[in-house]
Amino acid sequence: MYARIATLLSLLAFACSAAADLRTPVLRWQYGGCTSFCQTGWYSSPAIVDVDGDGKAEVIAGSYDLVLLDGATGATKQRAASSARIWPGIAVADLNRDGHLSVVIGRNNGMATAFDAATLTPRAGWPVTPFPGYEVRALALGDLDANGTYQIVVGGTQSSSRQVNVYAPNGAQRAGWPRLQSGDAGYAAGIYNDDIAIADLNHTGFPQIFVPTDVHYVLGLNRDGSQIAANALFGTGKVWSQVGVHVNQSDDIRGYADCSATGHGQRPNFAASAPAIGDVDGNGTLEMLVVGNVYDCTLGNPAGDLHHLPWLLNGDRSRFDASGYDWTAIPVASAGSAPLSEGNYTLIEDAQPDAVLADLDGDGKKEILYSSYDGKVHAYWLDKTEHGAWPFAIPGVGLHFASPPAVADLYHDGNVEVIFATWPQATSIETGKLYIVDHLGAMLQAVDLPAPKGDTWNGGMAAPTLGWLPGSRNLAVVLMTWSSGAVAYELPQTPYARTLWPTGRGGYLRNGNAFNDRIFADGLGD
């Protein structure tokens, strides 16, 4: 009898293993956009779109050159060459409302450019130079006037003033911008990641712009450049950028932290804090999620850096406290969450804690996900704890960091999966991996990325993009990698996948809102 049970268990294990193997990602193409070598791919999440209306999706990706790739093969169709890197995700929209898509990017030469998506020729009025001598690290699109026309919002690394600018589709600078101007109330500094979110958190009928910067304050801006009022809890007449964010809300209310002795004052730095927008508790009101780099203010940043932690904020800058979930006190950091490396680029490139919101367990409430400099991917529930096997610690010898995740119900079974790429130390000869984990953080798949072409190591630092490529009914994941260009994998058994957070910053507007949450009935994404 025991032998029979053992045999049945063995068969069950084999069946489970076989099912897992059948779902292993399959490499479709690699080295997209490369020539005799591959340019370095940074944090720019690619796009999967049909640029010419022929019913077949292309891939648009950026390293230094911006490239348009055949979706089926990865062959280069168009190239806009440059020696200036692209950091923000590839933004795509019909800017001119002429039926033709535009692609909008920011570069480290201080320029932003809108291109015709099918030809990669600059649109009339572009490029613009919002931040001469500085890098465009953040770029998002938003319908600021609620009339169907998208404006382009950009953020730069300059620290003294004028960190955020807004442009019309024709490249004209919008009246009232840039901000902050010299003499404006509040505090802001440089923007060092894709740190712009756009949404109507205050129910005005028009979206607002929210931008964390290289301080412990968040800019809250109206479409005309004026600043958004903060809750009277923080004092009369204050705006968002005058209310500092701290670990303890009592310091927010008092207006400062006690930095006189080690351990007394803890607050976040938001230089790399790309925020997300969503209705976290399902009550019809939007909240903003931002993940901060918490540090001891006695020691300063980065010397006093402790860990990444999330904040949930309302439209008036107060902390989320609704539906039985009190976020006036934020989660307590878990053991082992200290930074493994920051700013030591000869060792490893930095992790970016882009915020992601998605309902992992199907209860109608959104969970909070981000990748951290502790070598883990975190997922918090609204009860301020990490469930199951979360956080997911990246396996391997030495240091490894993870890209911001994408989220989807891949197999249309009600179970949600989390997809991300990793990268190793720059001193290694490794490649990173493409990971798929389940909603409780258990690993389902791990596949090596392609060998490097032009460097000693390879990995994926940009958020994956999910979509349908020509030639298959299955969902694909496209990665922008460090040294193998754009790479595409087919995800078997996924023709009816439901995407929840399918690309960097949530969607091709790159403004912190989820692109979609619907089932593609024919598996083709149209």
Predicted segments, located by residue:
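Extracytoplasmic/lumenal domain signature
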Residues: 20-518
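N-terminal signal peptide c-region/cleavage motif recognized by signal peptidases
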Residues: 13-15, 19
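Bacterial N-terminal signal peptides that target proteins for export
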Residues: 1-9
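Ser/Thr-rich, Pro/Gly/Ala-heavy low-complexity intrinsically disordered linkers and tails
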Residues: 521-525
